[in-house]
Amino acid sequence: MTTDVTHVTAGVTTFFQGEHQSHPLFRIEPGIPCQDAREQASELMGYVRELTIVGLMDEKPMMIWASHYLSAMAKALMDDAELGMRG
């Protein structure tokens, strides 16, 4: 599969802003092909799904929190890829 490198991440989306969403701790890197970013987001969401199920079924809240943070990463990847695809 060929990757369209004309559309790349913008590098402006932050995630996990810390207490009260006031401190950007992580940012998506600019210049990543949007297709790659979207594929990685999909992979992360698969992990989110599995961790959520394990956390609920086994009553392990740490798994739920892990899935929460991974979903924030996946959302940031998708949001930044969307910005990159818009131009």
Please provide the spans of the model-predicted regions.
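Sequence/structural signature of long amphipathic alpha-helices
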Residues: 1-87
